[in-house]
Swiss-Prot record:
UniProt entry keywords in alphabetical sequence: Allergen, Disulfide bond, Secreted, Signal
Signal peptide annotation: 1-4
The name this protein goes by in its record: Venom allergen 5
PANTHER family listed in its UniProt record: CYSTEINE-RICH SECRETORY PROTEIN-RELATED
Lineage: Eukaryota, Metazoa, Ecdysozoa, Arthropoda, Hexapoda
Length: 209
């Protein structure tokens, strides 16, 4: 997926590229000690679900059918792309997921093509939480979003997963994941990378129709 790319040449203001720092391997790192890793990376079926759930939700918002918000409803969009899966984004996301640095964003995940955004979700239980339930955690942040305010330093922590999900100009997605047992719980950890990135402070996630 990323053969022949020298990620050490891809610069980010915030630091060294994940694949430059950790290498191409997606094998779980020493940090994962104590966790019984059941599987690394989404299945083909899960990849389809990730894309279809994102596009279902993006279309719902674009059509003006999302009634939640602070205040709701969310305005319809005139520039909402449908997302497609990108293996390079997924590979970079998986290298980072396999480091077991939980709920922390990596410093640099860009590709030669564009800057890359990121959403992270995690859930555990006696049954394995499915991938769509993780994505819905991001969608649910819409309840706190005021479209007219856009993205600010103050609200970013509460709404940033939602706004990246519905960033109109984003076109591609690729995700990494780990499923593992710990303390008798089945855990599902998901990292999705988005290109081109969204979530610029002071900007609106999409153009109002």
């Amino acid at each position: 997926s990323s053969q022949g790319v020298d990620y050490c040449k891809i610069k980010c203001p915030s630091g060294i590229h994940t694949v430059c720092q950790y290498g191409e391997s997606t094998k779980p790192s020493k940090n994962c000690a104590g966790k019984v890793i059941k599987s690394v990376g989404p299945t083909e079926e899960e990849k389809k679900l990730i894309v279809s759930e994102h596009n279902r939700f993006r279309q719902k918002v674009a059509q003006g059918l999302e009634t939640r918000g602070n205040p709701g409803p969310q305005p319809a969009a005139s520039d909402m792309n449908d997302l497609v899966w990108n293996d390079e984004l997924a590979h970079i996301a998986q290298v980072w997921a396999s480091q077991c640095q939980f709920l922390v964003h990596d410093k640099c995940r860009n590709t030669a093509k564009y800057p890359v955004g990121q959403n992270i979700a995690y859930a555990g239980g006696s049954n394995l939480p499915d991938v769509v339930s993780l994505i819905k955690l991001w969608e649910n942040e819409v309840k706190d979003f005021n479209y007219n305010t856009g993205i600010t330093k103050q609200n970013f922590a509460k709404i940033g997963h939602y706004t990246q999900m519905v960033w109109g100009k984003t076109k591609e997605i690729g995700c990494g994941s780990l499923k593992y047992m710990e303390n008798n719980m089945q855990n599902h950890y998901l990292i999705c990378n988005y290109g081109p990135a969204g979530n610029y402070l002071g900007q609106l996630p999409y153009t109002k129709k």
